[in-house]
Regions:
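Exported/periplasmic ABC-transporter solute-binding proteins
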Residues: 20-271
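Bacterial N-terminal signal peptides
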Residues: 3-14
Length: 271
């Protein structure tokens, strides 16, 4: 009897799991960091669906959505003219600052817009040129498909137009890595390094310096004082979103969802 009861319970559990509708959310690794938290909380409260988050980069997420391979896309940059067509619904769920980070031992406390521009263009190559030690600057950036990189370059004017397409215009010798965590790892281990990461990813392994004398924090971002800021976007096809995906989006924009976003270090779109 005990074996029969256990078998029955296992069968019921498996059936319930199979019946749960999966909602796939794909895109920006920066947005995925907070989306993982939102999805976990949502999944705990809703047994009839399961939200799966995949951090693969903004461009890849937008592409998957257009191909119908994901339910919801995530982007940490604005969509390009080519990407933003009438079939997509695009909306912000939060705002995030791009923090400029250096090694903990670096005495530099602030960088101006012009200085940061020149560092990434390769015009400023030594820390002594901005009040630091006589050391060559190791410049770290993100991969070409990164929404974080696209936002950073757009905000600083580090782009140019070729054949009607906006492309990167930074120094090609800058070190390219593929995640916020990798930027932090390199900056933490290299006393000469500088990089940029999502403000919500800043931890004690690196030092975030001020930009134009303003600290990257939720208050300064919400008040518009910190100028290296960008939206976290969700997107879906207007005429092709199922009830489970729509329900999760409403949760993200709900009071509970927005509070989780704020608790995780980002600026919510709703208070």
């Amino acid at each position: 009897m005990l074996r029969i009861a256990l078998a029955t319970l296992l069968s019921i559990t498996c059936i319930a799991h199979v019946q749960a509708e999966e909602v796939n959310v794909s895109g920006s690794t920066s947005v995925a960091r907070v989306m993982d938290v939102l999805a976990e909380q949502y999944n705990n409260q809703n047994s009839d669906s399961f939200v799966a988050v995949q951090g693969i980069g903004s461009t890849a997420g937008i592409t998957l959505l257009e191909k119908g391979a994901t339910d919801i896309g995530m982007s940490s940059r604005f969509l390009t003219v080519q990407e933003n067509n009438e079939s997509l619904e695009v909306f912000p769920i939060a705002y995030d600052g791009l923090a400029v980070v250096v090694n903990l031992a670096n005495p530099v406390q602030n960088v101006s817009r012009e200085q940061l521009f020149d560092i990434y263009k390769g015009k400023i190559t030594n820390w002594k040129q901005i009040g630091g030690p006589d050391q060559k600057i190791a410049v770290v950036t993100r991969e070409a498909s990164s929404g974080t990189r696209a936002s950073f370059e757009s905000l600083l004017g580090l782009t140019r137009v070729i054949n009607d397409r906006t492309v990167s215009d930074i120094n090609p010798t800058n070190l390219v890595v593929n995640s916020n965590s990798m930027v932090k790892t390199i900056v933490n281990h290299n006393p000469h390094a500088i990089g940029f990461i999502s403000e919500g990813s800043v931890d004690r392994s690196v030092k975030a310096i001020t930009f134009e004398g303003v600290e990257a924090n939720t208050k300064n971002i919400s008040e518009g004082k910190y100028k290296l800021a960008r939206p976290f976007l969700l997107l879906h096809k207007k005429d092709d979103i199922d009830d489970d995906a729509d329900k999760f989006i409403k949760y993200v924009l709900s009071k509970e969802g927005q509070l989780l976003i704020e608790e995780y270090g980002y600026t919510p779109v709703k208070k």
